[in-house]
A protein has these predicted regions:
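An alpha-helical support segment within catalytic cores of ATP-dependent transferases
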Residues: 2-19, 23, 118-174, 184, ...
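ATP-binding pocket architecture of kinase catalytic cores
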Residues: 26-130, 137-144, 148, 166
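Active-site acidic catalytic loop and adjacent metal/ATP-binding pocket
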Residues: 28-41, 46-47, 155-203, 217
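Active-site phosphate/pyrophosphate-handling residues
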Residues: 65, 177, 206
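Active-site activation/catalytic loop segments of kinase-like enzymes and analogous catalytic loops
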Residues: 202-232
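All-alpha amphipathic helical-bundle segments outside canonical DNA-binding/catalytic cores
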Residues: 232-240
Length: 240
């Protein structure tokens, strides 16, 4: 048994009370966390142990609130244990489909339409321009030409944003990479809500299209399903 799991169960007695004694752990993919599929006395679970370097960059209080709201909507795996200080998270293990569903773009579009139009009040706000400014500081010297181009894009975007249309912030996942979209029997469930916040709908929509590498046809199917999810979602992403 990995030492970090032994330490987590030692330092957090509720883990043993909920899961039972840990018996076997299989590492899973994860960038900002160590994730294990855990066989324990009371069943099988996913156990997330955050890496130390993420302590100052992720608001665990906000994540816990947003995850609970998303789970109540049926869009996320419900937590059975979450520590709002350390970020330790446990969910029940689920069966993940061996192959990506052919209609994943439609499923994901419908799910996002439901999330964005739910009216849930997520903690935190995510603004693309602020993210860009923060990233820009570290990339300025290495990628001067690319940064200049991005500056032009953001100046154009800002001019459009200030042309009279109010910013629309909706509950957003914020990190829709393929690894965070689990295809399970019954549909898609989203995991890793660490970067969730209130954001413009375009953040999740563009992120999903780019990270999943959707073709033009898949993108149309994705956006079409998004608009059909609810009447409110249709107003968030009108056809071009």
């Amino acid at each position: 048994m990995p030492i970090r799991i032994r330490e987590a169960f030692r330092d957090h007695p509720d883990l043993r009370a909920i899961c039972g004694p840990p018996r076997h752990a299989v590492p899973q993919a994860g960038l900002t966390n160590q994730v294990y599929r855990l066989e324990a006395g009371n069943g099988d679970y996913y156990l997330r142990l955050p890496r130390a370097q993420t302590a100052d960059s992720i608001d665990r209080q906000a994540e816990a609130r947003n995850l609970a709201l998303a789970a109540a909507l049926g869009l996320a795996l419900p937590p059975v244990y979450i520590d709002r200080e350390t970020g330790i998270l446990v969910t029940r293990a689920v069966e993940v489909l061996a192959e990506t569903p052919a209609d994943l773009p439609q499923q994901l579009g419908t799910l996002l339409g439901r999330l964005h139009s739910s009216g849930a009040a997520f903690a935190g706000e995510l603004h693309a321009d602020k993210v860009f400014r923060a990233e820009r500081e570290g990339l300025d010297q290495l990628y001067r030409d690319e940064i200049d181009l991005l500056e032009q894009v953001f100046r154009w975007s800002a001019s459009g944003a200030n042309s009279g249309s109010a910013e629309r912030l909706v509950p957003s996942h914020g990190d829709l990479s393929p690894g965070n979209c689990l295809a399970v029997p019954g549909g898609i469930r989203l995991i890793d809500w660490e970067y969730s916040a209130m954001a413009e709908p375009a953040w999740d929509l563009a992120y999903a299209v780019l990270e999943h590498g959707f073709s033009k046809a898949q993108e149309r199917a994705f956006l079409g399903a998004y608009r059909r999810a609810t009447p409110a979602a249709a107003s968030l992403c009108p056809p071009a």
